């Protein structure tokens, strides 16, 4: 018989286990908050925003909802979705896999994916970035963040949890965004040390993009 954990999406298993520890470990990321400020400065009042891999809802969904925007947060982890709904009552949250979630073209003013693609393979990451680019209306924004390291299917521990990680180098990840039809308006690099005894410092890359207007 297949164990329950083996039938579930690996990312869901990892983040169910981490819960609020993940939020605490990354709460001090100034680069993440600066990225959110970049987006907030450009959104029209009451914008509809998709938050992919919403986690506990903080800081992304919370910052957007507090500013009066209509936020849909999605995550494969039921624990994270429950925490987010409790912590950010002004947003909507769904347990869903962004690879399969139906998305209408141009149905959002902006989309965010902060470090939520790393447990997908490269083809899946490219496909998801393409889906987000299409889901954002022409003239809308997309913010993508990753750990810009050229690795594929690397197994290791993340905050004590076993993970299998795939990522792109910085230039290659930017190329993914461009191939999806996004214009990269700005990119920011940062080094961040999560506040967790089993975490190690990691490079972060933030791409601030726009879907060109027709």
What is each stretch, according to the model?
Residues 99-111:
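A short acidic, Gly/Pro-enriched loop at the edge of an enzyme's catalytic core
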Residues 126-138:
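A short glycine-rich, Lys/Arg-flanked "PGG" loop and its adjoining helix->strand segment in the class I
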Residues 193-214:
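Core SAM-dependent methyltransferase catalytic element
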Residues 50, 56-100:
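Class I SAM-dependent methyltransferase SAM/SAH-binding core
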Residues 139-146:
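Conserved beta-strand signature within the Rossmann-like core of class I S-adenosyl-L-methionine
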Residues 165-181:
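Short alpha-helix
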Residues 2-45, 150:
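Conserved class I S-adenosyl-L-methionine
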Residues 147-164:
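Short, glycine-/aromatic-enriched active-site segment of Class I SAM-dependent methyltransferases
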């Amino acid at each position: 018989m297949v164990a329950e954990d083996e039938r579930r999406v690996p990312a869901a298993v990892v983040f169910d286990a981490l819960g609020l520890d993940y939020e605490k470990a990354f709460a001090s990321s100034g680069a993440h908050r600066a990225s959110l400020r970049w987006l907030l400065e450009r959104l029209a009042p009451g914008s509809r925003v998709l938050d992919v891999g919403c986690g506990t809802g903080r800081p992304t969904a919370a910052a957007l909802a507090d500013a009066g925007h209509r936020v849909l947060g999605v995550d494969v982890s039921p624990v994270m979705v429950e925490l987010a709904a409790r912590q950010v009552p002004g947003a909507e949250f769904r347990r869903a896999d962004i690879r399969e979630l139906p998305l209408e073209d141009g149905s959002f003013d902006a989309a965010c994916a902060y470090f939520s693609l790393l447990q997908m393979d490269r083809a899946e990451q490219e496909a998801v970035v393409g889906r987000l680019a299409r889901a954002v209306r022409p003239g809308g924004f997309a913010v993508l963040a990753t750990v810009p390291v050229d690795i594929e299917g690397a197994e290791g521990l993340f905050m004590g949890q076993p993970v299998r990680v795939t990522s792109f180098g910085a230039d290659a990840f930017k190329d993914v965004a461009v191939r999806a039809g996004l214009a990269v308006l700005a990119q920011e690099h940062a080094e961040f040390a999560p506040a967790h005894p089993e975490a190690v410092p990691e490079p972060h890359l933030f791409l601030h993009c726009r879907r060109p207007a027709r």
